[in-house]
A protein has these predicted regions:
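C-terminal active-site/capping subdomain that shapes the small-molecule cofactor and substrate pocket
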Residues: 187-194
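Rossmann-like NAD(P)-binding element
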Residues: 14-48, 52-53
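Short, well-ordered alpha-helix to beta-strand connector turns
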Residues: 6, 25, 51, 96-97
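Glycine-rich, N-terminal phosphate-binding loop of Rossmann-like dinucleotide-binding domains
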Residues: 32-33, 58, 103
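Rossmann-like NAD(P)(H) cofactor-binding subdomain of soluble oxidoreductases
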Residues: 38-88
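NAD(P)-binding Rossmann-fold cofactor-contacting core
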Residues: 1-15
């Protein structure tokens, strides 16, 4: 609020869990570590099947299980950074990047269109539809495994007690960048996407 980045905030996720609170809210985007996504969806069950659309930003989808919902579309913006927090905010982060949408709950078309419009129009992203299984397999290979290898490599170098800094090439620098990503988020991803 102080930086004029958001118009309104809530102190607790429990504030959201009422039809009265969300009656004037079009879209709620959950941006939490992957292991927290299911729990947050469960805690806001009063918002299920309302006119408010719910989406997430989790890099893993197979663990999200919801029954009888018509307003939840899963999203995965493919636009990240090894930096996190408000100090790492980048207004151009999403422009021309891809966002994967999954609709495992066969939600009402209006909710799918609302989520797609949000990512395309508000954030200038390109969207692609995948099944949950396809999403998790593709990103296990193209994102999750490379991050896992980077953590393992950097840890191996650290444990070797060798100073390789003067001999490090561009490839190692990319692994260093990847291994600098948020460890809580990546730990969740590795555990959830097996």
């Amino acid at each position: 609020l102080k930086r004029n980045i958001i118009d309104e905030c809530v102190d607790s996720i429990d504030q959201i869990n009422s039809k009265e609170f969300v009656k004037n809210i079009d879209l709620i985007v959950l941006a939490v570590p992957p292991k927290q996504t299911q729990g947050i969806f469960n805690r806001i069950d009063e918002v299920w099947n309302t006119d408010t659309t719910l989406t997430d930003t989790s890099s893993v989808k197979n663990h999200i299980k919801l029954d009888n919902v018509s307003n939840v579309i899963l999203s995965h913006p493919i636009a990240g950074s090894d930096k996190s927090g408000i100090s790492a905010a980048n207004e151009n982060l999403f422009i021309n990047k891809k966002n994967i949408l999954c609709d495992p709950f066969n939600s009402d078309k209006i909710h799918f269109e609302k989520v797609e419009k949000f990512w395309k129009d508000a954030l200038q992203m390109k969207t692609n539809l995948m099944t949950v299984n396809e999403h998790d397999l593709v990103f296990a290979m193209t994102s999750h495994l490379p991050h896992l290898v980077s953590y393992a490599l950097i840890d191996s170098i650290r444990l070797s007690n060798h100073d390789v800094g003067d001999n490090a090439g561009g490839g190692l620098k990319e692994f260093l960048r990847l291994s600098g990503s948020n460890p809580e988020m990546w730990s969740d991803i590795f555990v959830l996407n097996r």
